Regions:
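Terminal interaction modules at protein C-ends
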Residues: 2-129
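Active-site beta->alpha N-cap acidic-glycine motif
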Residues: 113-196
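Hydrophobic faces of well-ordered beta-strands that scaffold small-molecule active sites
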Residues: 132-136, 157-161, 182-186, 226-230, ...
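Catalytic beta/alpha-barrel core
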Residues: 135-139, 159-164, 207-214, 227-239, ...
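Alpha-helical scaffold elements lining the catalytic groove of polysaccharide deacetylases
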Residues: 198-220, 237-242, 271-312
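Active-site groove signature of glycoside hydrolases
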Residues: 216-236, 315-324
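Catalytic grooves of carbohydrate-active enzymes
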Residues: 235, 303-346
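C-terminal domain-boundary segment and adjacent tail
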Residues: 250-265, 269, 325-374
Length: 374
């Protein structure tokens, strides 16, 4: 009996075996152990990798195969070309001649690139064959108007700047950023004696070498332009003796030439441009002529209607008009462009789309075949 446990001894408190740690250290071990056990349980229940796709497919019931659905192919869309050619800095510099005085003149590059092609605005040749164009001339006399012209007119409208415009290079860069093709107005002596401040005009009263020097001074006023705009017919454009050194300088530097000539007779400048291989365009359409019966809005609509007229066997027409910058003209062009977007008979293209390039001109282009690409 003495060896039998007394009451309560069978339920004596269990004690850790001798040699195991006790106290705070044991508590830390217990917490660490519980944490590891919980982490393992969570990994097993939550983060276990999903069954393989092959297993899921094998376990799924077989389904009957269906015929593939044949969708209609989308029509091919030609990627829209960049408005201007992407020229590297080296290519641009190669089209610039730096004079001993530090002036920068345009020139034909070593590879044969001519500025009148390199700086022309691109357009989609797959559009309607009938083409219209707009050239706003004498831009720069009024800064507020010039800003509206550049910022608000459609990019297809080409701009001809007065060479005496202050900070002209900056304004021409801004025009390019808004997708406008740019030109310089040729400074020709006005019979009424009105001229631009700081610009020496080309004159029938001086010799050819002096006129070339004055033309070069004008060329240095900006960069990235296609060529020159001859504003009105007169002694400079009508006399071959006066015009030849001027057109030759334009040809030698790879620039283009535009004439505004309402008369039916070709000028000496046109004949020389053909002979010397200059890219050339001419118009007799002055849209803001004050005595026009239908006003500017009517003249714009008439230009598009006449160009879009067609009948079998007749080639597509093209024409461009010129006008001066003013607020009414800007508003009229913006509204006209919106009307033009709702028809498909004519396309609005920059003035380069109205240039002609005859045999000698084409021979010069072939020296750099990339110039023939649209």
């Amino acid at each position: 009996m003495a060896d039998e446990p007394g009451p309560g001894k069978a339920f004596a408190r269990w004690r850790l075996p001798q040699g195991l740690p006790s106290g705070p250290f044991a508590a830390y071990l217990l917490v660490i152990g519980l944490t590891a056990a919980c982490a393992g349980l969570v990994y097993f229940l939550v983060d276990r990798p999903p069954p393989l796709i092959e297993e899921a497919v094998a376990a799924a019931p077989a389904v009957s195969q269906t015929k593939p659905v044949n969708s209609l192919k989308l029509p091919f869309r030609r990627p829209r070309p960049l408005e201007f050619r992407m020229l590297t800095l080296a290519e641009r510099d190669d089209m610039v001649e730096v004079t001993p005085d530090g002036l920068r003149l345009p020139k034909i590059s070593f590879d044969g690139w001519m500025p009148w092609i390199a700086y022309a605005r691109r357009y989609d040749p797959s559009g309607p064959a009938a083409r219209v164009g707009l050239l706003m001339i004498n831009v720069g006399a009024d800064e507020a108007l010039m800003m509206r012209v550049i910022d608000e007119l459609p990019g297809e409208v080409s701009l001809a700047f007065l060479p005496g415009t202050p900070d002209l290079s900056r304004w021409m860069k801004r025009a390019h950023a808004h997708n406008h093709e740019t030109y310089l107005m040729m400074p020709v002596e006005d019979p009424e004696g009105i001229g631009e401040r700081g610009i020496r005009a080309i004159s029938p009263k001086v010799d050819g070498a002096e006129n070339v020097k004055r033309l070069q001074e004008t060329m240095t006023r900006g960069e990235g332009y296609v060529g020159f705009v001859m504003p009105t017919p007169g002694p400079v454009s009508q006399s071959e003796e006066i015009a030849r050194p001027i057109v030759k300088e334009i040809a030698d530097r790879g620039l283009g030439l535009i004439e505004i000539n309402p008369g039916p007779t070709p000028t000496a400048m046109y004949r020389l441009a053909t002979e010397l291989g200059v890219g050339y365009a001419r118009t007799s359409t002055v849209l803001d002529y004050k005595l026009a019966r239908n006003g500017l809005d009517g003249n714009l609509d008439r230009l598009a209607e006449w160009t879009g007229e067609t009948w079998p066997g007749r080639p597509a027409r093209h024409d461009f008009g010129v006008l001066q910058p003013d607020d009414d003209a800007i508003d009229a062009i913006v509204a006209w462009r919106q009307r033009l977007a709702h028809q498909s008979a004519v396309s609005l293209v920059p003035i380069i789309g109205h240039f002609e390039c005859r045999s000698v001109c084409m021979e010069r282009l072939h020296r750099q075949p990339d110039q023939l690409r649209p």
